[in-house]
């Protein structure tokens, strides 16, 4: 029970955490109880303990900064008269209705045959005729012909390499008349070879697509004569019309708060420097369900608004019902505020964009009224581990070729990657809301990889989707180590497999059907490659352990010898190597031609390329095994979660590497031993695969070290232009990240309950504005009582979230913790603030170091 009338020694400690003047603190120190303290803060001497602490939220929040918040018109009251911060603009709802998916072709055909029309689709516009559409279709037919032709030739060579030439010597009548074992012995080698040949054709066609994409990107970038690039449609200096309002939205969920708000601040300041700030608003859309992180987000939002004078321009909202993950978060924004903006730029938690880039995107949208989405090509930067720096180098050197190549083949029917892109709001709201996939199981429910689907729906609705591959000023970060990358890949794998259910949905453009197919192949190629290697090993075992059948026809006069053509094997191997590695060589040639200084010079960039090629060869089999596991997990319905421990230096501990890579190492050893037993000479061909698996543990650990990454940077290895001449936005992001980490708020939920100002901020930003109905009051009392009884460590997540979202319950818990001197809460709070920059403004009272006692006790 609350004992507010006794005078606690901790009253001075409470006042020490309010930014009061000496006179104000001395005056309030004379209060005889917490009730009187809150009454005097609220200027309401008649208020009871619970009412007084609620009424004091405003003074506790604004003390020392009232003018700042009032000038920005940030203070308001809710329907119950409680003070609240205007952390988001007024809601003006827009109708957002997702169209149900009709994924079953047979049902659609049956309904048509029985005269039952399918449900009408929302009206869609036709993309106006344009020359680029005809050119794009011709280019894609050429690409298809090149891929198929190249695959047929390679398949013919592969067929000649295999020892058993065709099924013509297999007699069906003889098979039906002989024993099952004899049939298996006779057919098995041919079945293996046929399976290997089919898998080879699929994989070679996949490699061929990447090769031709990179080659055309190389020619586009080398000549600079791309008359269809969308960035050429704007002069780049046109004034932005007042009605072209753009919302920058950053959906986040349990992210690194210092880094998120550092990037947001750098982007905001760059937009302000461009002179177009009045055309942009910024929204942080949080789906965070970790209460400590949620409170840190609140404080970070307040800090960044103060530091940039961004009140009324930078907004924050945390959803309490996390429906449909990221796509649901964007739907919620569109429903509440989307009608107020003409365009929306979606940022990732690690995105940074320059003001000029953002302004250029708006100008391009204005100049191209048929464009629905314009995607930039984000440049990876900002990480220092050896693994991340090699990946940054690879994406920065090779990535532009593939991005330009994608644009060459797709033109205005291209990709959207979910971030660092501008979207036209009206068609997005009308056509791109995502309904859950029908049915049950792992591939039903909320869509995980929303970006490809939204691009397909935008094009289906008659709007273009473009890649502005040459637009500078768009940045992102990559995972710091292999295991973090694989954790991300598991989500993407499941999402891309789900998206393939939309392959036959009515109205999808063929290009986006191909995008769904390539999304699947990005991960399905791994188990296909693994199966190819397993079958090749099985064929080796067959040739080694089974006696060859030289006479398989009645009255056969001459033996049927297995055939080997090593010259064809060498030719095919050389061709495959060219397809895999020529794009990397072309990338370096392009850098030589354009200027290699920003990459460390010609020698260093070439050496970096060779080292990266070796590293990618080491990691390819490791990724193959993991991606195979991810695909199997998705089909078996295993949950797509992977909880990695926190790593301050972003490095991988040996224990985690052994746990994650141990099975691969054992597989590599066993596989190598089997092949060595079957045919030691074949081990040389398999060595790159099994050797990589055996070395996966040390490679994963060593490549995650920041020290090695910085040492390589000092030697100008894996250098990228953003490290050679760092843009101002990235410099600012790095500076603000370090500052934010220094001022990071720890134990946020405890701070929101105990700390006077943090509690006031949390109450003013709480989103649940319930009334005083009896059931609600009973639930509040139950939650507060439970929190007082079990303390912060005993509270479950749902109770924490409910308390943080309810300003009434949070103020009552705050009052009771201090009035009853609840050690479980106050001791954790004291420990949290000892080394925290958000420390008391005055030294703690000596008596407050231990358990507070009542005055006169």
Curated annotation (Swiss-Prot):
**Originating organism:** Pseudomonas putida (strain GB-1)
Q: InterPro entries from the xrefs? A: Glucans_biosynth_gluTrFase_H, Glyco_trans_2-like, Glycosyltr_2/OpgH_subfam, Nucleotide-diphossugar_trans
Q: What is this protein called?
A: Glucans biosynthesis glucosyltransferase H
Q: What protein family does this chain belong to?
A: Belongs to the glycosyltransferase 2 family. OpgH subfamily.
Q: Name a single GO cellular component.
A: plasma membrane
GO annotation (BP), single: glucan biosynthetic process
Q: Which Pfam families match?
A: Glycos_transf_2
Which pathway is recorded for this entry?
Glycan metabolism; osmoregulated periplasmic glucan (OPG) biosynthesis
The protein's job, in short, is: Involved in the biosynthesis of osmoregulated periplasmic glucans (OPGs).
Q: What are the TM regions of this chain, as residue ranges?
A: 142-162, 196-216, 515-535, 572-592, 606-626, 682-702
Its membrane topology is listed as: Multi-pass membrane protein
E.C. number: 2.4.1.-
Question: Where does the record say this protein resides?
Answer: Cell inner membrane
**What keywords appear on the UniProt entry?**
Cell inner membrane, Cell membrane, Glycosyltransferase, Membrane, Transferase, Transmembrane, Transmembrane helix
Q: What is its main location?
A: membrane
SUPFAM superfamilies xref list? Nucleotide-diphospho-sugar transferases (SSF53448)
Traced from the root, the source organism's taxonomic lineage reads:
Bacteria, Pseudomonadati, Pseudomonadota, Gammaproteobacteria, Pseudomonadales
GO terms of molecular function: hexosyltransferase activity
Q: Which domain of life is it from?
A: Bacteria
